[in-house]
A protein has these predicted regions:
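Residues at secondary-structure transition points
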Residues: 20, 24-27, 31, 58, ...
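N-terminal first-folded block
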Residues: 13-51
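Short, well-ordered beta-strand segments in beta-rich or mixed alpha/beta enzyme
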Residues: 13-20, 50-77
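Glycine-rich beta-strand-turn "strand-cap" elements at beta-sheet edges
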Residues: 2-13, 51-59, 87-111
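Intrinsically disordered, low-complexity acidic/polar segments
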Residues: 26-28, 72, 108
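An amphipathic, aromatic/His-enriched active-site/gating alpha helix that lines ligand/cofactor pockets
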Residues: 35-47, 66-100
Length: 111
């Protein structure tokens, strides 16, 4: 959900990045990502939580998250499903993730 400019009172937190997954672990990575997204989307303060594959290279997975606040993101990091997901990463990923955190104070629809 893209929040409109009027809806952004405090900084919304956006997390965006990518990671390369192991070819032999792709099916397991998809299952883990789906479970993580399902659990995370139920969290208070989560506006969006998505994984997607690169169209040119299906071993590259993108992550996009939107959080109402830094506090909501911190609560997310302390959840049992986050701990379980992080514990699975070594068997799923082929290298370090490139992930950025953005603090957004305004947003407007394009076009």
């Amino acid at each position: 959900m893209l929040r409109t400019e009027a809806m952004v009172a405090d900084a919304m937190i956006v997390i965006a990045g990518s990671v390369r997954i192991k070819a032999e672990a792709r099916a397991a990575a998809v299952r883990a990502a789906l479970a993580m997204a399902e659990a995370t989307r139920r969290e208070a303060g989560c506006c969006a939580y998505r994984f997607s594959s690169d169209l040119a290279d299906p071993m590259v997975v993108y992550i996009h998250e939107e959080w109402e606040s830094a506090e909501a993101l911190e609560r997310h990091f302390a959840t049992p499903h986050m701990a379980e997901f992080r514990g699975r990463l070594p068997e799923l990923v082929a290298g370090p993730a490139a992930i950025m955190r953005y603090e957004v104070t305004s947003a407007a629809a394009m076009g």
